[in-house]
Amino acid sequence: MSSRPLESPPPYRPDEFKPNHYAPSNDIYGGEMHVRPMLSQPAYSFYPEDEILHFYKWTSPPGVIRILSMLIIVMCIAIFACVASTLAWDRGYGTSLLGGSVGYPYGGSGFGSYGSGYGYGYGYGYGYGGYTDPRAAKGFMLAMAAFCFIAALVIFVTSVIRSEMSRTRRYYLSVIIVSAILGIMVFIATIVYIMGVNPTAQSSGSLYGSQIYALCNQFYTPAATGLYVDQYLYHYCVVDPQEAIAIVLGFMIIVAFALIIFFAVKTRRKMDRYDKSNILWDKEHIYDEQPPNVEEWVKNVSAGTQDVPSPPSDYVERVDSPMAYSSNGKVNDKRFYPESSYKSTPVPEVVQELPLTSPVDDFRQPRYSSGGNFETPSKRAPAKGRAGRSKRTEQDHYETDYTTGGESCDELEEDWIREYPPITSDQQRQLYKRNFDTGLQEYKSLQSELDEINKELSRLDKELDDYREESEEYMAAADEYNRLKQVKGSADYKSKKNHCKQLKSKLSHIKKMVGDYDRQKT
């Protein structure tokens, strides 16, 4: 699910304004940053944790698989009905013609000779002459229809009831394998069925081809009115409408299984690409209320620069250290600070800005004690002196707040207004968005580099608390800890941190300009 920090700017909605000449890509940030090309995106559109896959919808890949499985169930029932309706004629053939030579009721020696040939050829062909037995072909078709019916029913039921098994990659791999096997078998069964219900399709070049063609040729040419027609012979030579429908449905089932394989592969790829928290298998409300629009967010930012928020009574250091600072001067109820340590310093004026994209920024806001003075996040000092690690004072280098610097927020805002005045055309809006995307990538790269140092310091701090002071692990971790602290105190680190502050202010200003222009257009 989404984990946007509190009061962070809402995602920009590309459907609010869509010029005809602009069609941003939806998956620009789907892969690695160094692989994907840099294309233009709407302002503040990059929230990878907010990209949700609604797999509960019928239009999603799993939903399409459910629809196709239903269609296969219906088509299997139709095939069973069509093929079963013609079995009676094959039973008649078996009882009257397999035993030997049978002629027509009348017609003289000519028809009698045809009757002998038909009785001999047809009876002999039911297993001895190399012909496909119509009864065997229809039985094969019915068996495959039954297997497809069972498989499609299992896929549909497991998907509709939303079982845990149907939400795994292994499940869709099984669907791919079963669909491929059944699709191939249905294709073979359909071809065999065509050969069985259409004897002329298999008689060319065979031993009894001329006899079968002579028997069935009378049904392919106009016959005289009133001529007696043997119904059994007619159904043997002519493809019935039910049989034609069964053939068409057989090929449609093959196409349906091919589509199931396609969407199952697509589902597996999406499950590999996105995290489980980004996939919704059940319909639910992600947000209780709609996020505020750009205008309200800008007003909140303006109001936040004037009023200092009320101090929290107790704040737990969630990122910088596992220790908690409370208003009464305790650190996890182990260390006490005198009252003069936080009442002797006057309250400085603090500019509080909202975080941009990184969820870690949520923990980087200035701290305030109950006495009203400003406190920066700091590492606690060790309970006792430890060799190899320098003492961490109250003003440690653990603060990662980018809202303080040599240049005030008002001065930065004036600079950005001169550089990025209000938008007056779509071309200018396109230029602003390209600048926003470029700045966003630079900001994310710098902030990721700074965050890595902070995370490593936090990890080493926890390890130092676990190791014995005399151990080699403790000394190695202490050396690395001190080295990273020197890195944080370097001019290069401070320059990057200040540059992140400027980039954040720039991106916020560009977003405001784009939002103002979009509201004017609407």
UniProtKB/Swiss-Prot annotation:
Region Disordered, residue ranges: 1-20, 360-407
Subcellular location, principal: membrane
Subcellular location, record wording: Cell membrane; Cell junction, Tight junction
Modified residues (Phosphothreonine): 305, 403-404
Effect ascribed to mutating residue 402 to D: Loss of phosphorylation, almost complete loss of binding to TJP1, loss of regulation of TJP1 binding and loss of localization to plasma membrane and sites of cell-cell contact
Entry keyword annotation includes Coiled coil: yes
Basic residues composition bias: residue spans: 381-390
Pfam families: MARVEL (PF01284), Occludin_ELL (PF07303)
Coiled-coil ranges per UniProt: 426-489
InterPro entries: ELL/occludin, Marvel, MFS_trans_sf, Occludin, Occludin_ELL
PANTHER family: OCCLUDIN, OCCLUDIN AND RNA POLYMERASE II ELONGATION FACTOR ELL
Family classification: Belongs to the ELL/occludin family.
Name of the molecule in the record: Occludin
Organism: Homo sapiens (Human)
Protein encoded by which gene: OCLN
